[in-house]
Amino acid sequence: MANAMFEVASGWGLRVDRGPNWLLVRVRSNHDGPPDNEPLAERLWHLMEEHFVYRLVLELDEVEVLDDLVIRQLERLDHVARDHGGFLRLCGLSRHNWQRVVRNGLGDVFYPYGDRKEAVFTFHPPHELRKEA
């Protein structure tokens, strides 16, 4: 897996690794500098387009608080990725951040993978498919 870069977007530190057909992005809150005007999800989408990869794993274990605006951005990013045959997986979420995702009504959209390996190699069907099974 190639180590691609470390960037800052919208007050977030992004460490990007590229694997076969995957982008793995470690996200951390960056309070050292002023945020730019580009939303986190938009920067992530640009990375996906730049690498022609629409499967994205976000490692969120270094994010203290995932706010509602960012959660909604990630929901939209998941929709766009799916429109391109990909998807977004979240891993390393704290219990508090996972509860925030659920409170935003997205517990059926995302699954709380433990780490990047689980996110890449384990399949958890969307909630709608789990109901039908």
Put a short name on every predicted segment.
Residues 1-4, 99-101:
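Intrinsically disordered, low-complexity segments enriched in polar/charged residues with Gly/Pro
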Residues 2-43, 60:
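STAS-typified acidic loop motif
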Residues 20, 94, 116:
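Short, flexible active-site-adjacent loop segments at beta-strand->alpha-helix junctions, enriched
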Residues 30-110:
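Amphipathic alpha-helical interaction surfaces in cytosolic regulatory modules
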Residues 109-120:
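Short acidic-hydrophobic, aromatic-tinged amphipathic segments that line or gate anion-handling sites
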Residues 120-133:
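Acidic/histidine-enriched, glycine/proline-rich intrinsically disordered or flexible terminal extensions
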